A protein has these predicted regions:
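N-terminal Rossmann-like NAD(P)+-binding subdomain of aldehyde/semialdehyde dehydrogenases
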Residues: 1-146
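Short, flexible loop/turn motifs enriched in small residues
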Residues: 13-18, 155-156, 168-171, 373-375
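Short, glycine-/Ser/Thr-/acidic-enriched flexible segments
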Residues: 13-15, 39, 166-167, 191-192, ...
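Conserved C-terminal structural/oligomerization subdomain of aldehyde/semialdehyde dehydrogenase
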Residues: 25-35, 62-77, 189, 209-211, ...
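A non-catalytic, amphipathic alpha-helix used as a structural packing/dimerization or gating element
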Residues: 45, 49, 60-71, 199, ...
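Rossmann-like NAD(P) dinucleotide-binding subdomain of oxidoreductase/dehydrogenase enzymes
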Residues: 131-280, 457-459
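ALDH superfamily catalytic-core signature
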Residues: 203-206, 231-233, 239-385
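A generic structural motif
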Residues: 215-218, 255-256, 321-331, 425, ...
Length: 480
């Protein structure tokens, strides 16, 4: 079988580079593809044409582009689409994504369906995120609202830059709205997961979206840095250090760990068994890899029983072949990462304060080392001191700390929380939760942290990121 060669894409035109990087199978080391490599100079040179990307998209109305998104969703899910010097079926897409990322096939398919769902429902999503604003106002830059008020929105950038991760194909839903908003895309794919951006690009093109609105720059780290430097608005995905680095930079939206949590209120905690399925799903879904997975369950009592019940459910889970429909955990493909995380957890254990409850249900070690990859088996900690560092930590596998903490101290102790599910009917506490600025997405009721409604903003509203609301007048105001 010949190895697929995948070019750099410069405003829709393939570009072959002398520098190439191999993308290999995580278990066998077999070369799956050769990626032509961009460099920072190339990105800098192409940035001068960024305004043309928006011009190309503005040939079509937002409504027409939403329809093209719907068509692209179907093509992405079902069609054989071009990939470099070959083509790729949906089955081949899932297979190669699994082979290079270590993600089980069932999770690759689930992520594929999630991306397609967002594309299919793009009209509803944009209607919700714009609060019903007529989309032609975004295209034209100004217009009359239904209440007969002149409003103006100015695009903050002609293109959205993305520095994408290698280990989480689910994040691609966040940049898909750019195209129907007539904003071009400058994508730096993850080194082992270029498959989603390239397939999405081909699906958009097959649906009639102008190719010249998109750049794809596989390459080393300096390419990502240059994308962030040259684009007026960008997103980057990484760890806490990445989030800290770009904190306060209005040009960059940094997505990092979620520290998502379930908080059990005193009014309902005695019925914790009723919510066990919600807790388990929140921890284990998608291999526990996402910022939307639950990494902390907080309650004032019953925490030892809760931790034990979750540990019984997820502790026995073992690594399975990626093709097994029951596979529930993903491989760590970068040497040393899993071992370092496992050592860190062990170092955090403290008799009577931090206990690994899964140890007795695991029947083996947490760390499973294989020839070319490692696995971490699900881990549940019971933490009796809410100030201990292990009460608020997160790892890229099914890991959760069940923390004992009085309800009246929870909001001051949980720290930054991307998704907070509060299982309570206490109206006074619900008001406090609504007011808590350290919770981004708030769920009230037994809703898994990973059950996202895409009609809601995620880590900020992309409309507010890509457009600036400003004053506009083309006639004298009343009373002048």
């Amino acid at each position: 079988m010949s190895v697929v060669e995948i070019p750099v894409i410069r405003w829709g035109k393939p570009y072959e580079s002398l520098e190439k990087a191999e993308v290999v199978h995580f278990e066998t080391g077999e070369v799956m593809a050769r990626m032509h490599q961009a460099n920072a100079g190339l990105v800098q040179m192409d940035a001068r044409k960024a305004t043309k990307a928006r011009e190309a998209l503005r040939q079509f109305s937002c409504t027409e582009l939403i329809e093209k998104c719907r068509q692209a969703a179907e093509l992405y899910l079902t069609a054989e689409l071009p990939l470099g010097n070959g083509t790729q079926t949906p089955e081949q897409f899932c297979s190669i994504q699994s082979a290079t990322t270590g993600l089980p096939l069932n999770m690759c398919r689930a992520n594929m369906n999630k991306n397609a769902f967002v594309l299919k429902h793009m009209g509803d999503m944009l209607d919700a995120l714009t609060r019903g604003l007529p989309l032609d106002i975004l295209s034209r830059g100004y217009g009359m609202e239904s209440r007969n008020v002149m409003v103006s929105f100015q695009a903050t950038t002609p293109v959205l830059g993305l520095v994408l991760p290698s280990n989480s194909p689910g994040v691609h839903t966040l940049w898909l709205p750019a195209i129907p908003l007539q904003i071009g895309l400058v994508l730096k794919p993850g080194s082992s997961e270029p498959w989603t951006p390239y397939r999405m690009y081909e699906a958009f093109a097959a649906a009639g979206v102008p190719r010249e609105a998109v750049c794809l720059y596989p390459g080393p780290h300096d390419v990502g840095n240059k994308v962030l430097e040259t684009c007026n608005r960008s997103m980057i995905f990484g760890g806490q250090a990445t989030v800290d680095k770009y904190h306060g930079n209005p040009k960059v939206q940094a997505h990092g760990p979620g520290f998502s949590k379930i908080l059990l209120g005193d009014d309902l905690v005695d019925r914790w068994e009723d919510y066990l399925d919600v807790m388990v799903k929140s921890v284990i879904m998608n291999g526990g890899r996402g910022c939307i997975n639950c990494s902390g369950i907080w309650a004032s009592r019953h925490t030892a029983e809760i931790a034990d019940a979750i540990a019984q459910r997820i502790g026995p889970i073992v690594p399975l072949p990626t093709t097994d429909p029951q596979a529930a955990i993903a491989a760590f493909t970068t040497a040393g990462v899993a071992e370092a995380a496992s050592n860190q957890i062990d170092a955090g254990l403290k008799p009577g304060v931090v206990t690994d409850v899964t140890a007795k249900y695991r029947g083996g070690e947490r760390l499973v080392k294989q020839e070319r990859c490692d696995y971490l088996r699900p881990t549940v900690l019971h933490v009796t001191d809410c100030d201990n560092a292990m009460a608020n930590t997160e790892y890229m596998f099914p890991f959760v700390s069940v923390v004992q903490c009085p309800q009246d101290k929870m909001l001051s102790k949980i720290g930054q929380t991307l998704i907070g599910t509060a299982i309570t009917a206490n109206e006074k506490w619900i008001t406090e939760l609504v007011d808590a600025r350290n919770i981004d997405r708030l769920n009230v009721g037994p809703i898994p942290t990973c059950a996202l409604n895409w009609l809601q903003p995620h880590e900020g509203n992309i409309i507010d990121f890509l457009f600036r609301n400003r004053a506009f007048q083309n006639s004298l105001p009343p009373a002048h």
